Structure formats: C-alpha cells, structure tokens
C-alpha cells in the first residue's frame, strides 16, 4: 500500500513537471492551446519577465468559474522599459513557479490566487502581498527582466502572559530572465527561485513545527529560422526541489527531508502562416524524487523515478475571420515509473496520458476576448441543447493602449 501511494505521488510530481496540461483555471488563450510552450503568449512574461516589453501598455482580466477566481495584469512603459502589476495570480505562491509553465498543471494554482507548497500544507495557504514585474531593453537585440512576489498568511494569539502562539506560511518568488531578440536566433532564458517557509507554535514554542520547501528552475526556449514562415523551436528545463519538516517535542527534534529533480527537453517546428499559427514538438522528460520521514533513522526512506519517452504536443490557432480565432491543442505522453523503499520493496508502472483543449478568441481593434471551453461543449453541446456542462471553463479580456 505504501509503495502504491508513493508511486502515485511520483506520478503526480511528474505530471506537474512534464505533462504541461492545461486546466480550467489556466488563462484562456494558453489553456485553449493546451499549454503550448512554443506558441508565444502574454503569460510567458510570468516565468520569463524580460518578455514584458513585447506586451507593454496592456490590461488583462482573467475570469474563472466563480467571482473569487481570477487574476489581473497591467503592463505599462516605453519601448525601453516596462513594468507589470499582477493581482491574484497563484503561480506567485506556487512551488512550481520555478518550472516552465508547470503551474498550469496545478488545479487552482493560477486563478485562485493562492496555493500551499506541498510540504507545507499544515501551515495554511499564503496569499499574495505583492507581485511585480520589470523589463528593460539592452541595446537593440536583448532584454533583461525580473519578477518579485511575496505572500503570507497565518494566525496568532498573544496572551497577557506567556508566549505567543500561531501558525503561518510565507513564500518568496524571485525570477530573472534574459532574451536575445535577433533575426538569426531568438533566445529566452529564465532563472526562478521559489522559497516556502512555514511554522506552527499552536502547541507552544517548545513543541514548534517548522518547514521549508525550496524550488530552483532554469528554463530556456530557442527559435531558429528554417525557411520562410517556419522556425525550429527548442525547449529545455532543469528544476530542483528540496525541503523538509522539523517537529519539536519537549526539546527533541524529528526532521524529515524531501528531494526531487526534473529535466525536460524538446524540439519541433513552429509555422507562422498568413491566417494560422501551428506549433508541434516532441519532448523527453526525466524526474527523480526521494523522501526520508526521519533523517536520524536508517531504512525508512523511499525513492521514485519517472521517464517520459516520448511525449508529443500539438497546437494551432486559426484566423477563421478577421475577428474570430479558433484554438485547439493536445498532448500525449508515455511514461515509465518506478518506486522503491529501503526495505527492498519495489513497484513499476508503464502508462500513457492524453488530453486536449479548445477555445476561441474575438478581436475588435485593440480589444480581445478569449474563451477556453469545457471539453464536453464540443461533443455534447451546451445546456440548452441537452448538454451537461456550461459554456466556458475560463475567459479573459484584454485591451491594448
């Protein structure tokens, strides 16, 4: 049973790092493209902040399925420097902010505005205090950008006498990126650091529980011109995570530790045609993770690995008319997973995963509206035609000025 649950956990981690599947809480255009990494979008600026210059002087509102799900982005500046103010976007406080768009695979990680680091669930869920972006041009063919996000949430009690007690979680997101914008080669690089810290003194300072979860990600994307209207896109990412929980009881500390490493690489063509943009790429992925529930004891650790070989992603955006765009995307991945523990037990699983998304966009001069539709809308129709779901999973509206 333990091996089965560990194997399931390894699969979830792998899916977060490598599947790149879109969900109902992802922003609408990218969600309709099933989270394509090679068809460029304004959401690129969240993990590659230097690209903010490309989308300057824009306001975007993202609307989820309820009034408390959504986010906002305001970008303003000149052709030399741009600034961004972000409201209620959850990848600022997500442990997957260090991975290339992997927050798209976290339910609620985008438009719910807050998500706990997995190791720190017991400390509550932090909410964003500040989330800022900045980008500046370096010469004619380069740009540099930064992102800073801080989040916190908690409760505390301070009696007239005695020690204060409470529980809290704090997260810090620091991102930096560099792009080369030449005609022969376009290159986007980013380095992201996400730090989560939690503490719980509700049982007294002598019985404090504390934890940390640190994520580091290095991501790259390259576009090489092949021929007229065709580029070769190359993507890659390395993501490292480590942390643990320490529980104190009467001065005795018990500490646990977790470690995970993920690597992904892929390549494929991008077609920029007169009335369509098409991107397809194959990718390979590898991840490994280990857990030690008590670092002072032997023979209680476990580990797992997962290999994605191969994976393929396809997406398209078609201008049906001057004002109506259809979008669709899909992804298939075949994975080899294994899990073992120090007692000599092991388990393996080979499986495939598939998913698709669709939606549309409306363009009226400087105003755009994007909709990611429920999958069943395409096959069973809307409610008034006998279908079983609503219309849009998410919607976005933007105005350029």
Label the predicted regions.
Residues 22-98:
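N-terminal, post-signal peptide beta-strand-biased segments of exported outer-membrane/organellar beta-barrel
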Residues 358-369, 373, 388-401:
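Outer-membrane beta-barrel "beta-signal"
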Residues 71-75, 131-135, 173-179, 217-223, ...:
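Outer-membrane beta-barrel architecture
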Residues 93-124, 154-167, 197-211, 244-259, ...:
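Flexible, solvent-exposed loop segments that connect beta-strands
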Residues 58-59, 80-85, 140-146, 182-189, ...:
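Repeated loop/turn-to-beta-strand initiation elements of outer-membrane beta-barrel proteins
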Residues 215-338:
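Detector for outer-membrane/organellar transmembrane beta-barrel domains
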